[in-house]
Design a protein with these regions (language model features):
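Conserved, mostly hydrophobic/aromatic
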Residues: 26, 72, 159, 191, ...
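Carboxylate/His-rich catalytic cores and anion/metal-binding grooves
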Residues: 191-218
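A conserved hydrophobic secondary-structure block that centers on an alpha-helix together
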Residues: 162-199
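Short proline/glycine-enriched turn/loop motifs at strand-loop junctions of beta-rich domains
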Residues: 27-33, 64
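The feature marks proteins involved in alpha-glucan
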Residues: 1-19, 44, 52-56, 63-158, ...
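Aromatic- and acidic-residue-enriched carbohydrate-binding clefts of CAZyme catalytic domains
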Residues: 171-181, 211-242
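Structural beta-strand segments of beta-rich domains
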Residues: 20-24
Length: 242
């Protein structure tokens, strides 16, 4: 076992920062899972997760703090006919990542199979073409209480987060189309005047536009191409824009 990684725990899944480092846990039926840590220059350090409970691989890395970029590589059989496409040349996102940084750069590097032979694994490394998960500090428990509206009295307003405040004259320009814009007093007052009791947001998970849209200079405005269900879409962050 590498001295840089300890057994850790199988729960919770994802990256969990604590006083002794960060615990990484991911579910995979593969033969080996490798944690990939990236520095600010993109240099990669690989650590094999040392423990497995059922199909959950896990390890605790001392010294890893919030802000660390990471991903996984998984070894196993490459048998497309049997539904198995393990390929350690491909960097994988943590499905439980709570933040994702970077963009998908479409190209042959993202293909799991060789470009000239779909039955053979691709040897091209995909790390430079993939976004990475971001280790976050544990968030404090919410203190605000929710309104106790009866279901029969509820008025649910479905809204696209960016579109709702993109042109609102009373929301500051730097906040329009962001989470902070939706939470701005002017936006909330507008909802209250309408009699709305609950807001249902269209997709706010981290998403990417499809390749054919990018080729046409377009984007997936609605966000229905999620790559991380636990990571808020960074493009809606006012802080990320600043």
């Amino acid at each position: 076992m590498s001295p840089k990684i300890l057994p850790g725990t199988p729960a919770p899944l994802g990256a969990t920062s604590g006083p002794h480092g960060t615990n990484f846990a991911v579910s995979s039926a593969g033969e080996q899972v490798t944690l990939c840590l990236f520095d600010a220059d993109g240099a990669e350090e690989r650590l094999v997760l040392p423990e497995r409970d059922g199909d959950v691989w896990h390890g605790l890395v001392p010294g890893v703090e919030p802000g660390q970029l990471y991903g996984f590589r998984v070894d196993g059989p490459y048998d497309p006919a049997g539904g198995l496409r393990y390929n350690p040349a491909k960097l994988l996102l943590d499905p439980y990542a709570r933040a994702i940084e970077g963009q998908v750069r479409f190209g042959p590097e993202l293909l799991g199979h060789a470009t000239d032979n779909p039955s053979a694994p691709s040897p091209l490394d995909s790390a430079d073409h993939m976004p990475r998960g971001v280790v976050l500090a544990s968030a404090p428990a919410p203190t605000a209480s929710r309104p106790q509206h009866a279901l029969a009295d509820s008025i649910i307003y479905e809204v696209h987060l960016r579109g709702f405040t993109a042109a609102h004259p009373d929301v500051p320009p730097q906040l329009r189309g962001t989470y902070a814009g939706l939470a701005h007093e002017a936006a909330l007052n507008h909802l209250v005047r309408l009699g709305v009791t609950a807001v249902e947001l269209l997709p706010v998970h981290q998403n990417v536009p499809e390749e054919f849209l990018i080729r046409r200079g377009l984007t997936n405005y609605w966000g229905y191409n999620t790559i991380g269900f636990f990571a808020p879409h960074a493009g809606y962050s006012a802080a990320a824009r600043a």
